[in-house]
């Protein structure tokens, strides 16, 4: 085996998130609510040398299959990521992330007076105001949000 090869166990069934920008893998896990609490085997490789990028992160989650809306939510955190669905050790489906028109349940609004931060139990929804940047706007209070400073829910 060559020194440059990465040794990571193959998964039989589940999801592989590849080409995550280096150092962002833990943010991806947090945004998707993947914490291992359900007993699934999770493999995380951070800052792996990559030919396409200088470094990338890889996440493998056994027995969990991301839905399309989960895949598209990754566009803010990991715009160049690919999501591979694995069945019986084989690639069954490959998806590229794409920024949706709205993003719900990932971020909390940064406005402390927003109804989503009250005792009302209302989930936050961010509308994509601009794909450049990108720029998000809270659906409830219209605050423009800086993606890099937002808290995950």
UniProtKB/Swiss-Prot annotation:
InterPro entries given in the database record: Asp_carbamoyltransf_reg_N, Asp_carbamoylTrfase_reg, Asp_carbamoyltrfase_reg_C, Asp_carbatrfase_reg_C_sf, Asp_carbatrfase_reg_N_sf
Keywords linked to the UniProt accession: Metal-binding, Pyrimidine biosynthesis, Zinc
Necessary cofactors: Zn(2+)
Membrane spanning residue stretches: none
Cofactor detail note: Binds 1 zinc ion per subunit.
Top-level lineage group: Archaea
GO cellular component: aspartate carbamoyltransferase complex
Single GO molecular function: metal ion binding
GO terms under biological process: 'de novo' pyrimidine nucleobase biosynthetic process; pyrimidine nucleotide biosynthetic process
Matching Pfam families: PyrI, PyrI_C
Chain sites annotated for binding Zn(2+): 109, 114, 138, 141
Known role: Involved in allosteric regulation of aspartate carbamoyltransferase.
Family according to the record: Belongs to the PyrI family.
Subunit relationships: Contains catalytic and regulatory chains.
This protein's name: Aspartate carbamoyltransferase regulatory chain
Originating species: Cenarchaeum symbiosum (strain A)
């Amino acid at each position: 085996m060559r020194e440059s090869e990465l040794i990571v166990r193959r998964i039989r069934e589940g999801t592989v998130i590849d080409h995550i920008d280096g150092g962002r893998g833990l943010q991806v896990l947090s945004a998707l609510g993947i914490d291992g609490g359900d007993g699934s085997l999770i493999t995380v490789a951070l800052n792996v040398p990559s030919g396409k990028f200088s470094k990338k992160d890889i996440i493998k989650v056994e027995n969990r299959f991301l839905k399309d809306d989960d895949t598209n939510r990754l566009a803010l955190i990991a715009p160049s990521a690919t999501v591979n669905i694995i069945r019986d050790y084989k690639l069954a489906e490959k998806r590229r992330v794409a920024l949706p028109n709205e993003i719900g349940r990932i971020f909390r609004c940064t406005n402390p007076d927003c109804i989503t931060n009250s005792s009302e139990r209302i989930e936050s929804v961010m509308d994509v105001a601009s794909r450049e940047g990108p720029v998000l706007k809270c659906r409830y209070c219209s605050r423009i949000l800086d993606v890099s400073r937002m808290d995950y829910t």
